[in-house]
């Protein structure tokens, strides 16, 4: 039977990672995979995470199952981190998941359980795995305009016009902050206009919050999500702990379902636990316990916030350096968008041919749509990238 399987196209980003590893050149630069790296190219374990694990090692007495929906302390801590004072526990269902991707998948499954004819609106462009998962599930996908290729900013008028076509029973996937792959983000005033459109259409928002703390700060990065939560009666939020806690391999994520009333919350919580049971039963515990320990221990939380702020400000500094280098080489401000974008990524606007030349001639690897991982740069590689960008004619 297994001989009937068809070959699957490899994930382009993961294939690029393999190609980079096979490249024998000493000066090669990896700007492809979306993983934070420090100035030495290392993805470190955060100090507070180390300390939390040490506490767990000393105090844990069992490895038995936790609940189907996850550890209550983790659920509460994540709800408060994301929604702040706006968290309404009596109407919020919470699910621990296998990473942010698991949260996205369970959110889609939950919405499809509620509406078998679910249609999903996604930004053009979006994280490729969004569409891949939806296609695999057989869900109809509709794109809405988002990125302006000329300004490298948000095409907000196009976005509004396209989202106005959504209907009650549709889902609208929004990036909570640090848009992947473009780095172009909505202002709070623009979030308010999106909320007005959602109020009119009755569409269900699903907010992908994978990079809270990587853009303008923990509170600032959650502002759009909180605004939507304050105005729309039903909201799904898929959050990842991979980036802001640096626990990529622990696969720690969370799904919040904001409901109109307590009775609906009970229905959603039961359905979400059911989905976990049908998929993998109990969610991973170790990463969730790390997160809850950090967030509920004042000294660990303070140290985590300080280290996360250093990561965030470091990426902003790299953005400003790259934009400045490109300004000097080009004699113009046409690359100013690099400094304005937020998060790990920026889309440069290079053609596939230019991306290929940059890889072949300079040993610099980026995704085919010219998305670069800002965190993959350092003081030494920024001038090399800037020169490559100018020389290939971006």
Curated annotation (Swiss-Prot):
Its EC number is 2.6.1.57. Its cofactor is pyridoxal 5'-phosphate. It is found in: Cytoplasm. GO terms for biological process: L-phenylalanine biosynthetic process from chorismate via phenylpyruvate. GO terms for cellular component: cytosol. The modification N6-(pyridoxal phosphate)lysine is found at residue 243. InterPro entries: Aminotransferase_I/II_large, Asp_trans, PyrdxlP-dep_Trfase, PyrdxlP-dep_Trfase_major, PyrdxlP-dep_Trfase_small. It catalyses: an aromatic L-alpha-amino acid + 2-oxoglutarate = an aromatic oxo-acid + L-glutamate. Keywords: Amino-acid biosynthesis, Aminotransferase, Aromatic amino acid biosynthesis, Cytoplasm, Pyridoxal phosphate, Transferase. Substrate binds at residues 34, 65, 127, 180, 371. Coiled coil: none annotated. GO terms for molecular function: identical protein binding; L-aspartate:2-oxoglutarate aminotransferase activity; L-tyrosine-2-oxoglutarate transaminase activity; pyridoxal phosphate binding. It holds the Pfam family Aminotran_1_2. CDD domains: AAT_like. Shows activities toward both dicarboxylic and aromatic substrates. Homodimer. Belongs to the class-I pyridoxal-phosphate-dependent aminotransferase family. This is Aromatic-amino-acid aminotransferase.
């Amino acid at each position: 039977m297994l001989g009937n399987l068809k070959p699957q196209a490899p994930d382009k980003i993961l294939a690029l990672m393999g190609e980079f590893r096979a490249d024998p050149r000493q000066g090669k630069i990896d700007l492809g995979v979306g993983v934070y790296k420090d100035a030495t190219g290392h993805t470190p374990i955060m100090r507070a995470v180390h300390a939390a694990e040490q506490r767990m090692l000393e105090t844990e007495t069992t490895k038995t199952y936790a609940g189907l929906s996850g550890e209550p302390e983790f659920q509460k801590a994540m709800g408060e981190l994301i929604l702040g004072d706006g968290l309404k526990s009596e109407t919020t269902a919470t699910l621990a998941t296998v990473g942010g991707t698991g949260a996205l998948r369970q959110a889609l499954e939950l919405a499809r359980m509620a509406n078998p004819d679910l249609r999903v609106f996604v930004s053009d462009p979006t994280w490729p795995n969004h569409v891949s998962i939806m296609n695999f599930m057989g869900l109809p996908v509709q794109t809405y305009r988002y990125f302006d290729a000329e300004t490298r900013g948000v095409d907000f008028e196009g976005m509004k016009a396209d989202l106005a076509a959504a209907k009650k029973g549709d889902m609208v996937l929004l990036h909570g902050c640090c848009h992947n792959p473009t780095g172009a983000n909505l202002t709070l005033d623009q979030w308010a206009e999106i909320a007005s459109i959602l109020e009119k259409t009755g569409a269900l928002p699903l907010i992908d919050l994978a990079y809270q703390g990587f853009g303008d700060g923990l509170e600032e990065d959650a502002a759009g999500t909180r605004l939507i939560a304050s105005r729309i009666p039903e909201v799904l939020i898929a959050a990842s702990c991979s980036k802001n806690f640096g626990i990529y391999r622990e696969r720690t994520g969370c799904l919040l379902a904001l409901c109109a009333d307590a009775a609906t919350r009970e229905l959603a919580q039961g359905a979400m636990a059911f989905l976990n049971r049908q998929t993998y039963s109990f969610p991973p515990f170790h990463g969730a316990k790390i997160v809850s320990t950090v967030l509920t221990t004042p000294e660990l939380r303070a140290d985590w916030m300080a280290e996360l702020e250093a990561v965030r400000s470091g990426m902003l500094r790299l953005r400003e350096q790259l934009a400045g280098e490109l300004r000097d080489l080009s004699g113009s401000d046409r690359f100013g968008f690099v400094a304005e974008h937020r998060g790990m990524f920026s889309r440069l606007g290079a053609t596939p041919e230019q991306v290929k030349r940059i890889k072949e001639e300079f040993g610099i690897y980026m995704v085919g749509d010219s998305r670069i991982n800002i965190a993959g740069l350092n003081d030494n590689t920024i001038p090399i990238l800037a020169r490559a960008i100018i020389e290939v004619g971006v």
